[in-house]
C-alpha cells in the first residue's frame, strides 16, 4: 500500500448560522453555533485515512481543547498524527465561519499554531517525508516554506 503524507493546516472551525451576513459595523444574531475539526490539511488527512489507511499528518496545534478535538478526529479517521507539533506558546488555528440562509459563507482564519509549519519543522520530519510515496499539501501554512517543501521533495 502506498504511503501518503499530508503537510498542512489544522484548524478548529467555529461555524455560526445567520439569517444574513452583517454589514460593516453591524451586529446580527446567530441561530446556531458549532465547533468542528477542520483545516484544509486535517480534512485531507482524514479523507486519506478513511479511504486509504496509510496516512501520516504533519501539522501544528496548540495545547488547548481545540487541539484535542483535532487529534481525536485524526485518530478516528485512522491518521498517524504522532508527528503533529504541539505548541505551548500559541493556540490551535481557527476558522470563524458565518453561513447565511442561502448557504453563502464568510470566513476569517487565524493561523495560530499553523505558523509553526515551517522549514525547521519539516526538516525535523524529513524521515517521514522521504518515506512517503505521495506528499499532499495546500496553501494554509507559511507559503515560502510550503514552496520549499514542494521543491525539495520533487
Tell what function each PLM region has.
Residues 1-60, 65-69, 76-79:
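Glycine-rich phosphate/adenosyl-contacting loop at the front of the ribokinase-like
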Residues 88-90:
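Short, glycine-/polar-rich solvent-exposed loops and beta-turns at beta-strand/coil boundaries
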Residues 1-10, 60, 71-86, 97-154:
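Ribokinase/PfkB-type carbohydrate-kinase core domain
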Residues 93-95:
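Glycine-rich phosphate-binding loop of ATP-grasp-fold ATP-dependent ligases
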Amino acid at each position: 500500500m502506498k504511503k501518503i503524507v499530508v503537510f498542512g493546516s489544522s484548524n478548529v472551525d467555529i461555524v455560526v448560522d445567520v439569517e444574513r451576513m452583517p454589514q460593516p459595523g453591524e451586529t446580527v444574531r446567530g441561530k446556531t453555533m458549532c465547533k468542528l475539526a477542520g483545516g484544509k490539511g486535517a480534512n485531507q488527512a482524514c479523507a486519506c485515512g478513511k479511504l486509504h489507511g496509510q496516512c501520516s499528518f504533519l501539522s501544528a496545534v496548540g495545547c488547548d481543547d481545540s487541539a484535542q478535538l483535532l487529534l481525536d478526529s485524526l485518530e478516528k479517521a485512522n491518521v498517524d498524527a504522532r508527528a503533529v507539533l504541539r505548541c505551548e506558546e500559541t493556540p490551535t488555528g481557527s476558522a470563524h465561519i458565518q453561513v447565511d440562509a442561502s448557504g453563502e459563507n464568510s470566513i476569517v482564519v487565524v493561523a495560530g499554531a499553523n505558523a509553526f509549519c515551517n522549514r525547521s519543522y519539516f526538516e525535523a520530519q524529513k524521515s517521514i517525508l522521504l518515506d512517503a510515496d505521495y506528499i499532499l499539501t495546500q496553501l494554509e501554512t507559511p507559503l515560502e516554506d510550503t514552496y520549499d517543501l514542494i521543491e525539495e521533495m520533487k
